[in-house]
Amino acid sequence: MLVHVKRDELLAIAAQTAKAAPKTATSEAVLGIHVEADSRRSMLTLTATNYEIVIRASMGASVEQSGSVVISAALFPAAIASLPEQDVDLETEHPGQLTIRSGHARFRLSALSGDKYPMPELPFPDDTLPVSGLRSLARNTLFAVAEDGVPSPPMKCVRLHVGPDGLK
């Protein structure tokens, strides 16, 4: 695997994805983030799960060689955060090792083969929701939620309706 990406974009999706990884598990692979580089689509995809929730995030990348590894969910975002503000290279030079380079900085992290990761089955794209407008939707409706002291729990909620026309 050999990938060239922007540090800020990679840090954003690595931090987001790491939130789904459990702190403890019986399988070492579940504690990590599955990192997959696809040269055909020029995409880098990160996936993490705790068997209840799954976070999968993708970004455009310059992929010279496809491949996948599982990397520690605690170490991967921390290593990226400490890199200088420039392009980042991710490379599996040797089996069981991911090298992260940026400028003069270099990290070598232990990695598992991507085949070891228990990849969750995700629903078809028709059954998923884009979350791009969810933040603004919440921001525009939360003013109507009752303050503390109102005895009725439904008055402290926001109703979201998902239908064929989208999210309302």
Locate each region found by the language model.
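Structural preference for solvent-exposed beta-strand-turn elements
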Residues: 1-168
